[in-house]
Amino acid sequence: LQAGCPRRAYTIEEKLNSLRILFVGDVFGSAGRRIVREHLRHVVESNAIELVVINAENSAGGFGVTPAIADDLFELGAHVLTTGNHVWDKREIIDYMQSVPADSHERPRRILRPGNYVPGTPGHGSYQGTLPSGQQYAVINLQGRVFMAASDDPFRAADELLKHITARVILVDFHAEATSEKAALGWYLDGRVTAVLGTHTHVPSADDRVLPGGTAFQTDVGMSGPWESIIGVEREQVLHRFLTGMPAKFDQAKGDPRMSATMIECDGLTGRA
């Protein structure tokens, strides 16, 4: 937490029932997949992580996710994959997500698209599962509307999705552009979910905190990918577009890959962070 940001006092019961969650920020291209492959297992084992959630929407060359890449991330230890505005960039993911029924716990059911997409959109915006320990958990995926493509209201979508979730431990990936919109959702859901973590901007924010109701919040977890880039893309291509105003093809960068992730410790009985 930030210096000066007070920590909540934990009871003995909360410490005994503690659960650690790792959320890995937007995996960008082959460099992002490589750094996750090299470091995720060590991070999980050394920190006694029980639940791993990865945002995979940029994992296929920076644009979307394929079934093969999704399976690879599940093999590396992900329990659930979240996405965002690039979810449909690789069309084959649609059939993958629809290959199992809604009540399945197989891998295709555990990759989410934003839950505030219009009714009838393929896939699902939330998932509820059970860890080997018996601990129930849920993950909700939402997308912002400020400076983003049109979608339904994420606040009301969160209310609707929560009606069907019985787990106490609930993580929300809010894939959004505006800091204000992310903060607003964090406060709106404070005390009702375990964590609201922002994705999409690829820049990790230093505002991680636990809100008064026990909900962990961070504006953006950041990108797991090439830091020698402009948010994952080759620098020269982005600079050309800014300097000339002309269209430019964006290719994934490869240099200096780093993994950005946030760990949350919560009480498994109450869901409070």
Please annotate each region the language model reported:
Residues A3-Y10:
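Short, low-complexity intrinsically disordered segments enriched in A/P/G/S/L with frequent Arg
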